[in-house]
Swiss-Prot record:
PSII is composed of 1 copy each of membrane proteins PsbA, PsbB, PsbC, PsbD, PsbE, PsbF, PsbH, PsbI, PsbJ, PsbK, PsbL, PsbM, PsbT, PsbY, PsbZ, Psb30/Ycf12, at least 3 peripheral proteins of the oxygen-evolving complex and a large number of cofactors. It forms dimeric complexes. Keywords: Chloroplast, Membrane, Photosynthesis, Photosystem II, Plastid, Thylakoid, Transmembrane, Transmembrane helix. This is Photosystem II reaction center protein T. The keyword Plastid applies. It is found in: Plastid, Chloroplast thylakoid membrane. SUPFAM superfamilies: Photosystem II reaction center protein T, PsbT. The lineage of its organism: Eukaryota, Viridiplantae, Streptophyta, Embryophyta, Tracheophyta. It comes from Ginkgo biloba. The gene is psbT.
Amino acid sequence: MEALVYTFLLVSTLGIIFFAIFFRDPPKVPNEGRK
């Protein structure tokens, strides 16, 4: 049961960090050209 809690905490933490970075720096991906 503890493993489930730890996994949930890990996933939620990663998700929060991911969303924080995503909203802080909105992905501006140019469809044409990498420059």
